[in-house]
């Protein structure tokens, strides 16, 4: 039985004919399709990299156009993701209030909205930023929608590892927006986000693994024990912190960034090893405290990239 066939009675993916959908609520629903909270994290990595690339304050008009373009591109990717995943979203508690599940937006509207944002964002980047940034943004969108959502998500426990590449692209976009080229600094920060993504997302997946198991999505916490997942989190965390420290010896950052990277990275490793110790001890449920690392991961990436932006002014 497929996820769609097993959908509980009363859960609709499209509104009933004549369903009342207030215009204000409809606007909010279309905004929700873009997943604004996820996009906040993407922009946290984009704008600071522009400061590093400019070695100071970048052109503010360029920052604005890049930010808007990034929102449109990521929003389009997220809308298309919701269109593709609408069957399993209806079965998961965490996603049960998404616009396609509640019927506030129809699948056809969502698909058209996502495609429109993809086209508009690509043209926006090309005309107002540069075509390298446009190509990177389009590549990120296609990778997220096709490679992650369509090919990896429902097939492999390594889905978030390789699918996370799309979430690394804003770093490259921010750098290319300023310089119209890429450099090792951008590649290093890309790698930081690449190794950050699994230990950021797996703790959340541990919390909601029953949701994923119900719809047959093989997230690592679904197919492996907490002990195995925690070990993987620790391994990725150590690599992430090590990679974050490469910027300074290569001459891209100075003492301030290094201090923040060491302190925040040390705190991250403390939390990661704490989770591993609890998992080894067989702790389950609320006492596992896996969400502590999830929340800290957001603080960590915010602090690290704030340091990326501030460091050029202190050298």
From Swiss-Prot:
Where does the chain cross the membrane? 38-58, 60-80, 100-120, 123-143, 159-179, 184-204, 233-253, 255-275, 293-313
> What EC number(s) is this enzyme filed under?
2.5.1.141
* Keyword set includes Ribosomal protein: no
* Gene Ontology CC: one annotated term: plasma membrane
UniProt keyword terms in alphabetical order? Cell membrane, Heme biosynthesis, Membrane, Transferase, Transmembrane, Transmembrane helix
Q: Which CDD domains match?
A: PT_UbiA_Cox10
- Provide a Gene Ontology MF annotation, just one: protoheme IX farnesyltransferase activity
Q: Which pathway or pathways does this protein act in? A: Porphyrin-containing compound metabolism; heme O biosynthesis; heme O from protoheme: step 1/1
Give the protein family: Belongs to the UbiA prenyltransferase family. Protoheme IX farnesyltransferase subfamily.
What is this protein identified as? Protoheme IX farnesyltransferase
- Gene from which this protein is expressed: ctaB
């Amino acid at each position: 039985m497929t996820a769609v066939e097993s959908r509980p009675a009363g859960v609709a993916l499209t509104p009933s004919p004549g369903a009342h959908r207030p215009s204000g609520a409809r606007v909010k629903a279309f905004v929700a399709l873009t997943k604004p909270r996820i996009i906040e994290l993407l922009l946290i990595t984009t704008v600071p990299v522009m400061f590093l690339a400019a070695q100071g304050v970048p052109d503010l008009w360029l920052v604005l156009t890049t930010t808007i373009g990034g929102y449109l591109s990521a929003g389009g990717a997220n809308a298309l993701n919701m269109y593709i995943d609408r069957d399993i979203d209806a079965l998961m508690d965490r996603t049960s209030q998404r616009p396609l599940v509640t019927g506030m937006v129809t699948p056809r509207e969502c698909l058209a909205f996502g495609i429109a944002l993809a086209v508009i964002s690509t043209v926006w980047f090309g005309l107002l930023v540069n075509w390298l940034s446009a190509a990177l943004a389009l590549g990120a969108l296609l990778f997220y929608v096709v490679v992650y959502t369509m090919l990896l998500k429902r097939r492999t426990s390594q889905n978030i590892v390789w699918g996370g590449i799309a979430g690394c692209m804003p770093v490259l976009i921010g750098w290319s927006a300023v310089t119209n080229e890429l450099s090792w600094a951008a590649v290093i920060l890309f790698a930081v986000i690449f190794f950050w993504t699994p230990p950021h997302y797996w703790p959340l997946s541990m919390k909601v693994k029953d949701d994923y198991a119900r719809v047959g999505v093989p997230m690592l916490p679904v197919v492996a024990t907490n002990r195995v997942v925690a070990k993987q989190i620790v391994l990725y965390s150590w690599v992430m912190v090590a990679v974050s420290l490469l910027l300074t010896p290569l001459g891209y950052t100075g003492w301030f960034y290094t201090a923040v990277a060491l302190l925040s990275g040390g705190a991250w490793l403390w939390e990661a090893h704490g989770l591993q110790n609890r998992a080894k001890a067989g702790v389950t449920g609320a006492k596992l405290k896996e969400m502590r690392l999830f929340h800290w991961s957001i603080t960590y990436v915010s602090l690290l990239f704030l340091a990326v932006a501030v460091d050029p002014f202190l050298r």
